[in-house]
């Protein structure tokens, strides 16, 4: 059975404010009507590598993500089937044995830095949003987040930013801005843009009713 949900993509650089935009949409549209998927859950398992090598892995390259699994999950949700989202441990760089089940909803909201890079993902999205934030602000946010939430040291965050995060953003993330239907300037704190997106979602949902 085809469920035909509306698929929304929220992209942007690391720590750009994607989650803030996603949460604003969830609050306005209603979490009971949205299946929320974070692309970060789909990082490939690195348990076969020594810990030091895992720490040097390029997580900002498209090949770091299991997009085949994400596509399979999107297609399953569109077919009215529940899916089990993977859980990733950012401290040890491995996929954990437990999952989180989500049920089909009228709206699927996917967020991640690279969700517009892969054509196979882009083609499935009805509304594409890009959160555009200054690089210095993104770095400060990332530094605070990785220290507080992921147990990282200041030195390791800076090293990773210079080695992979910044160059991969310029090569793979920034160019995908051209695919966006709406660009959120200033880190996503744009209530007018949120109003426009929510109105578009509500209109689409009414047309499906």
From Swiss-Prot:
Enzyme superclass (EC): transferase
Q: Which domain of life is it from?
A: Bacteria
Biochemical pathway? Pyrimidine metabolism; CTP biosynthesis via salvage pathway; CTP from cytidine: step 1/3; Pyrimidine metabolism; UMP biosynthesis via salvage pathway; UMP from uridine: step 1/1
Query: Keyword ATP-binding on this protein?
Result: yes
Q: Give the keywords, sorted.
A: ATP-binding, Cytoplasm, Kinase, Nucleotide-binding, Transferase
| A GO molecular-function descriptor | cytidine kinase activity
InterPro entries in the record: P-loop_NTPase (IPR027417), PRK/URK (IPR006083), Uridine_kinase (IPR026008), Uridine_kinase-like (IPR000764)
Which transformation does this protein catalyse, written as a reaction? uridine + ATP = UMP + ADP + H(+); cytidine + ATP = CMP + ADP + H(+)
Q: Name one GO biological process term.
A: CTP salvage
Q: Which Pfam families match?
A: PRK (PF00485)
Transmembrane segments annotated in the record for this chain: none
Nucleotidyltransferase is among the record's keywords: no
Q: Residues that bind ATP, according to the entry?
A: 12-19
Q: Which family does it belong to?
A: Belongs to the uridine kinase family.
Query: Can you say what this protein is called?
Result: Uridine kinase
Species of origin reads: Chloroflexus aggregans (strain MD-66 / DSM 9485)
